[in-house]
Amino acid sequence: MTRKTRRLWIVIACLACVGSAAALTLRAFSSNIVFFMAPSQVKANPPSPDRTIRLGGMVMAGSLHRINENGTPVNAFEVTDGQAAVEVHYTGILPDLFREGQSVVALGTVQKDGGFTASEVLAKHDETYMPKEVADELKRTGKWDPRFGKAPDASSWDTMTAKKAGG
Amino acid sequence: MFGPEQGHFALALACVLALVQFAVPLWGASRRDARLVGLAPYLAVSQLIALGYSFLCLVMCAVSDDFSVQNVAANSAVSKPLLYKITGVWGNHEGSVLLWTLILAVCGGAVSLFGRNLPDILRGRVLAILGGVSAGFQMFCLLTSDPFDRVFPAPMDGQGMNPLLQDPGLAFHPPILYTGYVGFAVPFAFAVAALIEGRVDAAWGRWVRPWAVAAWCFLTCGIALGSWWSYYVLGWGGYWFWDPVENASLIPWLTGTALVHSAIVVEKREGLKIWTVLLAIATFSFSLSGTFLVRSGILNSVHAFANDPARGVFILALLAIVIGGSLTLFAWRAPSLTSTGLFSPVSREGSLVLNNILLCSICAVVVTGTMYPPFMQLLAGRTISVGKPFFDAATIPLTLPLLLAMGVGTALPWKRAQLARTFSHLYAAAGIAAIGLVLCFWKLSGILPIACGALAVWVIAASVSDVLRRIGIGHTSVQGVWERMKNLPRSSWGAALAHIGAGITILGLCGMSQAEHAIVEVHIGETRSLAGDDWTLLDVHDYIGPNYKAMQADIAIRHNGKLVTILHPEKRDFTTQSQTTTEVAIHTNFITDLYGVIGDRHGTGQDTTYVLRLHRNPLAPWMWLGGLVMAIGGAFSLSDRRMRIGAPKRASARNMARA
């Protein structure tokens, strides 16, 4: 085996592996990328029910209630970004850090009736922290400008929204 | 004696020593001045002593509750147990950077002590590179994240630590993981030194490999420990979430695994030299970017450093110098390295090349998946995320040929192999793998888990049969087998063990893909069944812990009416931090984990119900057990005489004396 043929073999193996890696990556990207959406974006152009998205916003104060579906507990709450609110259904135990009036990110699909069924709810934050996506959304909707001090207190901000949404 | 000022001074002293350690040996080596080069080990050891003292000072500050130190005030509290006061030192940004540089200094010290048989010039250059990296990060520590900053006025008590982090698993996870990350600095330094020298030979491969293997063992342990922690602490029933922090440790592990294998080719056959040097540089570069970019939040969000832009800019500059510098040197000098060993594609070398290509392809996929969301955020302004479905779909198909090649590779001879002959050694293993395939069809569902499971059995069977063949089972007498067992190099035993460990981990992952869970809401005394087991909620009671209130459940699990175990999952409420944590209860028989979590309480009186999450996780412990076996395999091959630096020299000296 000469140096040239050996090199040829290595190049072929490299191309095959890198090619299949690229093909797999692209295929996986096309079906598995998860977009982040705020409730107002969901209301404006709802994604198709087979598309998984991440929905982020504030849990509307006083909206959490429980439904029992055949012995399985379902948590229902509304997530808002100050413009619109989406009803979220989640089967399972809400994370330890889940609070009404605080930010939350839910992974799931939008149903035909406009509700959101979550397969996972994330609330990895403490009293002061909010997920970056939610903070960005707040800035985008003009609820908070970082140039003028800290983010508004989550609970007060949210009751304000709740009233606005109600009225 | 151990105040923060002394610690600060010692850190500054270590930084100066590291700078000298960088400059003097390099200058000496270029002038061929043996005295200057000979200074390097002394400088490395004194830098280690100064840094060790500095670290000790920080530990003493935390232990003695010196809340005038900003770092201690922000992360410790009087009521914290002593163990967590000590381990809490590296549970925050400043302390972990200090620990990082300390481990780097320990590596330098180890090269000085164990590298006595290296040529002086090479050792000097290796230590100089390590010193340079050290100096950079100590400067980062001193200028932007000083762990010894004082605060005035000093608070009466510290702010305490996240209760989630008060866990022995997490306490020892960072040092082990960091040792893995930082350990790859030594192969990196060897690679840069070889590029400066313009020479890579079999001896270089022999010197580099033990360091790479040692770092790889630590990284393997660190990843397994981190995954185990998230399994039993976070209570989601998952073990790997493919989030950027986890991927940051997996990426250098993949290239590090490739490095450990390609260095064998350099050592035995003087081939793949340029590639091995590149892998050494890439692995350490990934370690560096992993620890610093991801952990400090640059990757997650480019704006996370907004409150302290100096830190982000400094770290980016440092990464650019280390990674850019070494790659430039590589581009300049690599063409002068030529390989001599010729081999056919079907040979041990060929299979190692295939292993490297596949590992690097998997690595490229993981890098793409990790980097794509932040780049999309930056360029297109769209927030997206990729998760488990993406990584599963893209990496598992690439793992299958890797597993297949793992079994064949060790059976192939060097240089040129005859396929028919090799396959005749593998009949038994293939038979066992076929049985495994049938078992997998019976037990598992889904094409990928079945294929992975059968291939994992194949890897284990092929590794065992390879060892059996080498020690001559069935060919020679019992005495002959014993003799051969003693003569079989430990690195062969280690390789077999590591491959078996990989097989065990893959089997564990396949088992976990079949995990079942149920979320139920029950009254006390009610029974629900999950996958053949009956789970009964016997009782729930409240109690008061040292700094929390807890709700504890008693859940009895019966299989066909026979009591298996009683689980006691808890929910703890830490009032001072206003945080709740979930204490998972796990019953394991090393085949199946029964995993119970208690959620919220609803209603009052007779109508009180509790939400429970019940998991049945087949083969879960095997995932971490396999990691441990892999690391033990690595450690075993480290104990091989041939791997110990300088051993060949001694052996040849003895042979000469005998002659």
Curated annotation (Swiss-Prot), chain A:
Subcellular location field: Cell inner membrane
One Gene Ontology biological process: cytochrome complex assembly
Functional note: Heme chaperone required for the biogenesis of c-type cytochromes. Transiently binds heme delivered by CcmC and transfers the heme to apo-cytochromes in a process facilitated by CcmF and CcmH.
Region described as Disordered: spans on this chain: 141-167
Keywords, ordered alphabetically: Cell inner membrane, Cell membrane, Cytochrome c-type biogenesis, Heme, Iron, Membrane, Metal-binding, Signal-anchor, Transmembrane, Transmembrane helix
Family membership noted in the UniProt record: Belongs to the CcmE/CycJ family.
UniProt name for this protein: Cytochrome c-type biogenesis protein CcmE
SUPFAM superfamilies: Heme chaperone CcmE
Top-level taxon of the source organism: Bacteria
GO CC terms: plasma membrane
Chain positions recorded as heme binding sites: H125, Y129
Organism: Gluconobacter oxydans (strain 621H) (Gluconobacter suboxydans)
Compositional bias of kind Basic and acidic residues: 141-150
Topology class, membrane: Single-pass type II membrane protein
Periplasmic side: 29-167
Transmembrane segments: 8-28
Gene Ontology molecular functions: heme binding; metal ion binding
Main location: membrane
Segments in the Cytoplasmic topological domain: 1-7
